[in-house]
Amino acid sequence: MTLNSDYLNLLDLMQITNANFPIGTFSHSFGVETYIRKDIVFDGESLIKALLLYMNEQLLHGDLLAIYQIFKLLPKQKINAIWEIDQMINFQGLARETREGQRRIGQQMVKIYNELFNCELLVEYAERIKNKKSYGNPAVAFALLAMHLKIDLKTALYTHLYSTVAALTQNCVRAIPLGQVKGQKIIYQLKHVYFDDIVNKVFTLDFKTDFCKNIPGLEIAQMEHEDTPVRLFMS
């Protein structure tokens, strides 16, 4: 007896967004470690503020808007425009560690996705990365697989938002430290209070003017992290 394909797709989605999925997210704080080192982030409330800053700026205008755009482009077979998103999101990253971290995570996602699933566009993506025509990006890889699994846009946005924030929260909880139960409470609060607002914002954005918009403070923290002599994270 085999499972219904809809359930299988859901389980596949749960597998690839699990915190234990080996794509290297446990190695990155995306600048939050700088805030921790400066005692700007030191407890649960200050961590929530930092996570909201990341979610409402880089994650919203970067990953989530990229996923939204790819869901619009792929049904129209505008494949080259999807590869352009990979290049744009890479070039817009000013902080070297964060840019390279996203690239490594994206490349690892493409590699493992291709070992698990039979998706022609992900195979093409891997070839483009190998031939240095594309860089590799988590949002691009995830959007391609989500569409392959017939996941609807809103589910894809919520899932990517959750998996990214959950991984980052767990990393920060280790660094402060706060304890795993406190980390789970933070994730629960973010889901129930803020996720709807962030996902709904995606549908109000204009790709041409809003893609990769960011605020200086977060990128400065990410760039300062490059000169941190003792650190827990690669970014």
Swiss-Prot record:
Keywords: Chaperone, Cytoplasm, Nickel insertion. Its main location: cytoplasm. Disulfide bonds: none annotated. It holds the Pfam family UreF. GO terms for molecular function: nickel cation binding. GO terms for cellular component: cytoplasm. It comes from the Bacteria. InterPro entries: UreF, UreF_sf. It is found in: Cytoplasm. Required for maturation of urease via the functional incorporation of the urease nickel metallocenter. UreD, UreF and UreG form a complex that acts as a GTP-hydrolysis-dependent molecular chaperone, activating the urease apoprotein by helping to assemble the nickel containing metallocenter of UreC. The UreE protein probably delivers the nickel. PANTHER family: UREASE ACCESSORY PROTEIN F. Belongs to the UreF family. This is Urease accessory protein UreF. It comes from Ureaplasma parvum serovar 3 (strain ATCC 700970). The gene is ureF.
